[in-house]
UniProtKB/Swiss-Prot annotation:
Coiled coil: none
Subunit structure as annotated in this protein's UniProt entry: Homodimer.
Binding site for substrate: I15, Q16, G17, R30, S81
Co-factor binding details: Binds 1 [4Fe-4S] cluster. The cluster is coordinated with 3 cysteines and an exchangeable S-adenosyl-L-methionine.
EC identifiers of the protein: 4.3.99.3
Keyword terms: 4Fe-4S, Iron, Iron-sulfur, Lyase, Magnesium, Metal-binding, Queuosine biosynthesis, S-adenosyl-L-methionine
Catalytic activities: 6-carboxy-5,6,7,8-tetrahydropterin + H(+) = 7-carboxy-7-deazaguanine + NH4(+)
Obligatory cofactor(s): [4Fe-4S] cluster; S-adenosyl-L-methionine; Mg(2+)
Name this polypeptide is given: 7-carboxy-7-deazaguanine synthase
Ranges for domain Radical SAM core: 21-239
UniProt similarity note: Belongs to the radical SAM superfamily. 7-carboxy-7-deazaguanine synthase family.
Amino acid sequence: MAKGIPVLEIFGPTIQGEGMVIGQKTMFVRTAGCDYSCSWCDSAFTWDGSAKKDIRWMTAEEIFAELKDIGGDAFSHVTISGGNPALLKQLDAFIELLKENNIRAALETQGTVYQDWFTLIDDLTISPKPPSSKMVTNFQKLDHILTSLQENDRQHAVSLKVVIFNDEDLEFAKTVHKRYPGIPFYLQVGNDDVHTTDDQSLIAHLLGKYEALVDKVAVDAELNLVRVLPQLHTLLWGNKRGV
């Protein structure tokens, strides 16, 4: 019997708020579990135990049925998020089911684990965590993942994204970009107030940070080919979950 998939949330249709497919209409499947514990994580409930009672162990067919029940025929794209969904070898059955139904799959991971099913992902964002996260990137593992994708002719489906909270993070991002210059590269403003319910104050704060980051990138000759993004869903809905 296939091993179940630990699911915390299924929601949508909405839009993707981050990375290479920002603005893309999508459904979301959020899995539980992560091998990191980033200091500023905006989805810590996926790994800190606070939502343990909410985890549902589901088969690929059950997840797909719930997606269709919620989204009907109003979607052709599914984003798998976490936590770190790359920890789940058993996701292969679900991704294959999406492919069988002509539904594109997107996934974001920090780049610590490679899975063979990465080659089935249409939009794969690898987001190594910067110093502000208090995590340390293993570049050997990241090298292995990106080399494996290239060997499987999947370089067109992958991008790199680094979340920026401070100048040290920006320097880290430049190091990543220099190491992998041929991979599309995105910088994104980090949300440093993931608990506030004052949406207007949060939006003004994040837009100010976004402008400051754009100003820095604009004059940096090492960042001529990067794209600088806001966290779009936060500007629309604040810290609300399930949107």
